[in-house]
Amino acid sequence: MYLEFYGLNEFPFNITPDPRFLYYSPRHREAMDLLLYGIANRKGFIELTGEVGCGKTTTLRSVLSRLPHDVETALVLNPSMDGDQLLRSILKDFGLTIRGNDRLDYVEQLNEFLLMQAERGRNVVIVIDEAQDLGAEVMEQVRLLSNLETDEYKLMQIVLAGQPELRERLAQHDLRQLRQRILIRCHLSPLLEEEVIEYITHRLQVAGAGEGVWFEPEAIKKVYEYSNGIPRLINAVCDLAMLAGYAAQSLNIEESQVDRALQQLECKV
């Protein structure tokens, strides 16, 4: 609705995990570097945590888009499954036609695939998002997958991504063997107030906004107070604030437009 008025090519504050819109705060850049390092150097298990809405999925998609062409990837987005379903999901994401009907068949097929990739000099990555919701039996299956290795290196790298509860899960005594295998850990924290300014500006620029479209300092301050620096909440209020700005025919988003957005979100700061 407001795209033409602001001269935008697309909506700047959608909540879909589009890597093009990823703003690299120091924590996001560090997480990206650690993830890419762990994958390239075949470190086995890698852990990525962050609060809801802090950009974990977007960061993961950005990492996957930056991997070389000789890296095979599988992305598991639904953790609510048992061990057999997890294995089938992984095999399907690798583009394999599933053979057999039980776990031993699935593991054998996955191992054959991994060995074939190793012979070709190709790396393999499995990303499991929302991993804090994995059941105990599935967690154990994930650990067992890491046993698929050669004498020299891990046949696949497994990224476990989730909310801070994932760290609590992995701290449990019965998951100590899995926890001990995680060699790289990174955490995404909310943005600082000065980073919120850069975040909003970055997303506007990616969407095609010119210099005449911007958020007033008091408007940004109120966005930060509402969102506490969580990108998903920033997007929600900024999208509605721009709609309010369009209704007022104002290129600059003022505090009053953010107030209108917060009213629509039924929130009070």
What does each model-found stretch correspond to?
Residues 1-42:
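A short, basic N-terminal segment
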Residues 11-13, 70-72, 81-100:
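Conserved NTP-binding/hydrolysis module of P-loop NTPases
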Residues 41-62, 79:
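Walker A/P-loop nucleotide-binding motif
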Residues 62-66, 166-181, 190:
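Short regulatory helix/loop adjacent to the ATP-binding pocket of P-loop NTPases
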Residues 76-80, 169-172, 183-196:
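Conserved AAA+ ATPase "SRH/arginine-finger" region at the nucleotide-binding site
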Residues 82-86, 97-141, 150-154, 191-196, ...:
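Mid-core helix/loop region of P-loop NTP-binding domains shared across ATPases and GTPases
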Residues 92-95, 164-165, 173, 191-210:
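Conserved AAA+ ATPase "sensor/coupling" helix adjacent to the nucleotide-binding pocket
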Residues 205-269:
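C-terminal alpha-helical "lid" subdomain
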